[in-house]
Amino acid sequence: MLANSREELVEVFDALDAELDRLDEVSFEVLTTPERLRSLERLECLVRRLPAVGHTLINQLDTQASEEELGGTLCCALANRLRITKPDAALRIADAADLGPRRALTGEPLAPQLTATATAQRQGLIGEAHIKVIRALFRPPARRGGCVHPPGRRSRPGRQSRSISSRRAGPLRPAGHGLATPRRRPHRHRTRPQTRHHPEQPAIRRHVTAKWLPDPPSAGHL
């Protein structure tokens, strides 16, 4: 990545604005149907590539700008300056953290967290929807009640405590004395809907993993 001067950066943005103005004035009437489809494909590729440029700027703001300079948190600053909602700003910060360039504590440049996915985005091969699916594949399982139980094992503290108390009170309440022995209710089998997986889901997962997701991080990236 080249270290451009401020004047060069301004010229690049000005040239991009000028070319977009020219493109906006085109009527496309002379194109055939295949050519229009190809033009839409190229336009989609450009739209997908633009967020990759923003990742660099957001990560630099996150590491170099103070809250005094931003006028608050980075999320609030992006929401106010870009006129977007705070959830959208938070999502852009998260995308930049995963897909943007990084630096080690020593200042050494590091590859993005999701290296292959970031490369595909810079090439315009994938968009926001694809990235959302890829990140969901490696999302940690949600916790219930602050703890995670092993698969196939459920915690029922209420039922367990009632069972223990009934066993302890059994010798103290023989038949015919004290409280009557409660009648046992018939056991009810509860059925739970089972999740059905699409037969092609494993193949799709392997394909996405091999094409877009990064290799295991090496020791130099830690």
Curated annotation (Swiss-Prot):
The protein, known as: Uncharacterized protein Mb1614c
**What organism is listed for this UniProt entry?**
Mycobacterium bovis (strain ATCC BAA-935 / AF2122/97)
List, alphabetically, the InterPro entries matched. Answer: DUF222
Q: What is the lineage of its organism?
A: Bacteria, Bacillati, Actinomycetota, Actinomycetes, Mycobacteriales
Biased region (Low complexity) positions are 160-169
Q: Which Pfam families match?
A: DUF222 (PF02720)
Region (Disordered): which ranges?
142-222
What are the Basic residues biased-composition ranges? 182-196
Q: Which family does it belong to?
A: Belongs to the Rv1128c/1148c/1588c/1702c/1945/3466 family.
